[in-house]
Amino acid sequence: MSQLVETAADTQITQPEQLVVIVTSASLQTQGMAMVLSRAMQEQGVQLTMLLCDQAAELAIQSYQSPRALAPKGMKPEGLLQQIIDAGATVAVCALYLPNSSYQEQDLRQGVSLAQPAKMAEMLRCANSKVLTF
């Protein structure tokens, strides 16, 4: 006999899990771990949105270079961020970042946009979203 009623568990399986990662830390290791975990979850099928704020928003600047690579794989957070972007994540800088920095929108890495507060608020409220902050 076929099942006629879809359960909540069935619905969760068919909908991609939404993850909103907010990175604000200036710490190289914290930025690196945020990128490593975000990329790992993205590889597991999570639909990823990343918001870069405060000093972490520097990662979104095309010319930015971290002071050093992180062991054990010799990666820099901005390199991992580029992998995340290339894999289809939505990445944005905080709406307050550019107006309060010396950068313009054209300085952003390709694939990074300026966050729209109303849209971000909607994503944060979504019952299907998990929010992580670093």
Outline where the language-model segments fall.
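Positively charged, low-complexity intrinsically disordered leader regions
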Residues: 2-11
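Short, glycine-rich nucleotide/cofactor-binding loops
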Residues: 14, 19-32
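Solvent-exposed loop/turn segments at secondary-structure junctions
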Residues: 26-28, 55-58, 97-101
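Histidine-anchored nucleotide/phosphate-binding helix
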Residues: 31-46, 50
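Short internal beta-strands
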Residues: 48-54, 91-95
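N-terminal beta-loop-helix "entrance" segment that forms/cooperates
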Residues: 56-70
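A glycine-rich helix N-cap at a beta->alpha junction
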Residues: 68-93
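A short aromatic-anchored loop/beta-hairpin motif
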Residues: 84-87, 92, 99-109, 113-122, ...
